[in-house]
Curated annotation (Swiss-Prot):
Residue ranges with Polar residues bias: 263-285
Compartment list: Postsynaptic density
Record protein name field: Inhibitory synaptic factor 1
Lineage: Eukaryota, Metazoa, Chordata, Craniata, Vertebrata
Record-stated family: Belongs to the INSYN1 family.
Keyword vocabulary terms for this entry: Coiled coil, Synapse
The protein's assembly and partners: Interacts with GPHN.
Any one cellular-component term (Gene Ontology): postsynaptic density
Highest taxon listed in the record's lineage: Eukaryota
GO-annotated biological processes: inhibitory postsynaptic potential
């Protein structure tokens, strides 16, 4: 109190309510400490019970003979003695002896996974076959990358390879091949040619037949003898240029077509037609009249 009788605000006043709050806080702290002590006692009792259970397991498993060494034990075959010994040292959850739980092994496993990702074949990811250096048709890779002189030609219509169809001649361009030449049979992993190529032989046979027909006298090709009056002769035949021989062929092309039809319809094996003798066709009745 000052001279005027008013209380002094600078000095703390003794309030009974503040002391009651402190007492309450102290009581609460004591209660929490007591609860923690009870929990510790219960944990100690649980530890004692666990030790008793471990000792019973040791007694039950004492008759078994384990052939494994302590170094070879795993989590599935760990004996109860080792767990009981380590329960007091590092706790029952101490896994320090397990080597596969270390960080080094885990990092190695991640490195192994990345190695698998890196070591996968990357042929499909590389540039396409057309853009790789040194890439070419298969027939150029048969002799160690050297160009093959008898590689497949684009003009060959009888080749069954993919290159011939993909890079074939443009429409309107006729295949130019010198008569009498024959392709050499080639074998490759992807390119297979048919061994029997009869196009050249047929071309040679037709050319020789045309030459022989030019030298022989033209004979009329009639299947039957004229029984009635003779019919007027047909219109004059226009000479046309043969695509094979390059010279004009007269009326001799009519028996040539007849012989070609009979040749294709007959059942004969593949042989060299240049060795066959071409005889003119004569009707049976005409032969009989000639004899008379």
């Amino acid at each position: 109190m000052n001279i005027r009788g008013t209380p002094d605000l600078g000095q703390p006043s003794d309030d009974p309510s503040s002391g009651g709050e402190r007492e309450r806080i102290r009581q609460r702290m004591k209660m929490v400490i007591g609860q923690l002590e009870d929990i510790l006692r219960e944990l100690k009792e649980v530890a004692k019970e666990l030790r008793e259970v471990v000792s019973q397991i040791d007694k039950l498993t004492s008759d078994f003979d384990f052939e494994l060494e302590p170094d070879d034990w795993t989590t599935a075959t760990v004996s109860s003695t080792s767990s009981s010994d380590k329960a007091g040292v590092g706790g029952p959850f101490d896994l320090g002896h397990l080597d596969f739980m270390t960080a080094d092994i885990l990092s190695d496993s991640w490195e192994f996974c990345s190695f698998l990702d890196i070591s996968t074949p990357s042929d499909s990811v590389d540039c396409p076959e057309s853009t790789r250096p040194g890439a070419g048709p298969d027939y150029q890779l048969m002799n160690g990358g050297l160009p093959v002189p008898n590689g497949p030609r684009v003009e060959t219509p009888d080749s069954s390879s993919e290159e011939a169809f993909s890079a074939g001649p443009v429409k309107g361009q006729l295949p130019q091949r010198t008569p009498g030449t024959r392709e050499r049979v080639r074998f490759s992993d992807k390119v297979l040619y048919h061994a029997l190529c009869c196009d050249d032989e047929e071309g040679d046979g037709e050319e020789e037949a045309a030459e022989e027909e030019g030298g022989l006298s033209p004979e009329p090709a009639h299947t039957e003898a004229p029984a009635g009056p003779l019919k007027p002769s047909p219109a004059p035949y226009k000479p046309r240029r043969s695509p094979l021989t390059g010279r004009r062929s007269g009326p001799t092309s009519v028996p040539e077509q007849t012989r070609r039809v009979t040749r294709n319809s007959s059942t004969q094996t593949v042989s060299d037609k240049s060795t066959q003798t071409v005889l003119p066709y004569t009707a049976t009745r005409q032969k009989a009249k000639g004899k008379n």
